[in-house]
């Protein structure tokens, strides 16, 4: 059964446009509360990023949840993975995050976590959707839920992040720049790295509700690259608005993407005999990652794009490490979902163990040229179903004769078609990608 509201990563859209409206959030809170209450006594944690609309939606969700008899614990601005962690430690039935991740401030959305800190099962999302289409009824007055605020949430999460590296670990002597994207990591990330001994220069940690992800963070790396050079730092770390993506910059100012971070973490675990199985990437993972892992004898499989699919594959195989080139990195040996701060700490530990800088360590992975072009399209039939697009994709794949890949897919969160071509010759790859992107644009007109 297809879902009406839930996408690949919860519910997301433009603020003020259905369903990202206060009245829908009120009803969503009620529907979620009713669904969670079927599991017994109901306690729900609610956190958010720094978007100005978060206050509005927090109040609406709070009203809806309590009207269904659920108790609500408000966490305030916190990284998405912190809500997953705290949902477990508070033994809540669920955690809710108000965020649109790496999107600009005029988007917002809702993500749900189970009480185990994992994404909600499909059947529970479907139950919530069914309840959304029924009349809203308030529980009797004596059963209305209570609301409390958790004032030490940041401190709890900071200590959890620090616990992901061995006791006594010190990054003293390491000079780093971190870009918090004016988002949910703005308080906790500087504290984590400073308390572990690093010298920290902080960028984009003055959220005003409107500047989240605005020319900063993991989707706009220029500011961090410049700062690493001007500050003579050892490396830079960029988070996205809700703290579940991380990218890095080495001391030369070069960007280190999620594929490279995943390789560094996996190789470190492998060398210490703690990898447990293989590595999960996605259809967008660079071919070079697969080849480099193969050289180490590490199995590699590709999941669909989206961290929930990476997580599902990890769970099915009982493996520990997976991620996306966009910077979602999952370390199941420490947490239940993609966590940018914890992933960054694992990279720093790997560098410390090898006594290498990031620029040196990343050389072990030689990436194949990969060109990604995003093509925006309107409503109607997907351009991917057009015969001309299918024929061109097959022709390009055949022309690369097994030494490259073509991937055309719709975004799960935006009206975009992603055109990706990968191979050994960069000019050839770019030519093929531009040819396919032009064709997708033409058939979308």
From Swiss-Prot:
<dbReference type="GO" id="GO:0000287">
    <property type="term" value="F:magnesium ion binding"/>
</dbReference>
<dbReference type="GO" id="GO:0008966">
    <property type="term" value="F:phosphoglucosamine mutase activity"/>
</dbReference>
<dbReference type="GO" id="GO:0005829">
    <property type="term" value="C:cytosol"/>
</dbReference>
<dbReference type="InterPro" id="IPR005846">
    <property type="entry name" value="A-D-PHexomutase_a/b/a-III"/>
</dbReference>
<dbReference type="InterPro" id="IPR005843">
    <property type="entry name" value="A-D-PHexomutase_C"/>
</dbReference>
<keyword id="KW-0460">Magnesium</keyword>
<dbReference type="GO" id="GO:0006048">
    <property type="term" value="P:UDP-N-acetylglucosamine biosynthetic process"/>
</dbReference>
<dbReference type="InterPro" id="IPR050060">
    <property type="entry name" value="Phosphoglucosamine_mutase"/>
</dbReference>
<keyword id="KW-0413">Isomerase</keyword>
<dbReference type="InterPro" id="IPR006352">
    <property type="entry name" value="GlmM_bact"/>
</dbReference>
<feature type="active site" description="Phosphoserine intermediate">
    <location>
        <position position="101"/>
    </location>
</feature>
<dbReference type="InterPro" id="IPR005844">
    <property type="entry name" value="A-D-PHexomutase_a/b/a-I"/>
</dbReference>
<dbReference type="Pfam" id="PF02880">
    <property type="entry name" value="PGM_PMM_III"/>
</dbReference>
<feature type="binding site">
    <location>
        <position position="240"/>
    </location>
    <ligand>
        <name>Mg(2+)</name>
    </ligand>
</feature>
<dbReference type="InterPro" id="IPR005841">
    <property type="entry name" value="Alpha-D-phosphohexomutase_SF"/>
</dbReference>
<dbReference type="GO" id="GO:0004615">
    <property type="term" value="F:phosphomannomutase activity"/>
</dbReference>
<dbReference type="InterPro" id="IPR036900">
    <property type="entry name" value="A-D-PHexomutase_C_sf"/>
</dbReference>
<protein>
    <recommendedName>
        <fullName>Phosphoglucosamine mutase</fullName>
        <ecNumber>5.4.2.10</ecNumber>
    </recommendedName>
</protein>
<dbReference type="Pfam" id="PF02879">
    <property type="entry name" value="PGM_PMM_II"/>
</dbReference>
<keyword id="KW-0479">Metal-binding</keyword>
<dbReference type="Pfam" id="PF00408">
    <property type="entry name" value="PGM_PMM_IV"/>
</dbReference>
<feature type="binding site" description="via phosphate group">
    <location>
        <position position="101"/>
    </location>
    <ligand>
        <name>Mg(2+)</name>
    </ligand>
</feature>
<dbReference type="InterPro" id="IPR016066">
    <property type="entry name" value="A-D-PHexomutase_CS"/>
</dbReference>
<feature type="modified residue" description="Phosphoserine">
    <location>
        <position position="101"/>
    </location>
</feature>
<feature type="binding site">
    <location>
        <position position="244"/>
    </location>
    <ligand>
        <name>Mg(2+)</name>
    </ligand>
</feature>
<comment type="similarity">
    <text>Belongs to the phosphohexose mutase family.</text>
</comment>
<dbReference type="GO" id="GO:0009252">
    <property type="term" value="P:peptidoglycan biosynthetic process"/>
</dbReference>
<dbReference type="InterPro" id="IPR016055">
    <property type="entry name" value="A-D-PHexomutase_a/b/a-I/II/III"/>
</dbReference>
<dbReference type="Pfam" id="PF02878">
    <property type="entry name" value="PGM_PMM_I"/>
</dbReference>
<dbReference type="GO" id="GO:0005975">
    <property type="term" value="P:carbohydrate metabolic process"/>
</dbReference>
<comment type="function">
    <text>Catalyzes the conversion of glucosamine-6-phosphate to glucosamine-1-phosphate.</text>
</comment>
<dbReference type="InterPro" id="IPR005845">
    <property type="entry name" value="A-D-PHexomutase_a/b/a-II"/>
</dbReference>
<feature type="binding site">
    <location>
        <position position="242"/>
    </location>
    <ligand>
        <name>Mg(2+)</name>
    </ligand>
</feature>
<keyword id="KW-0597">Phosphoprotein</keyword>
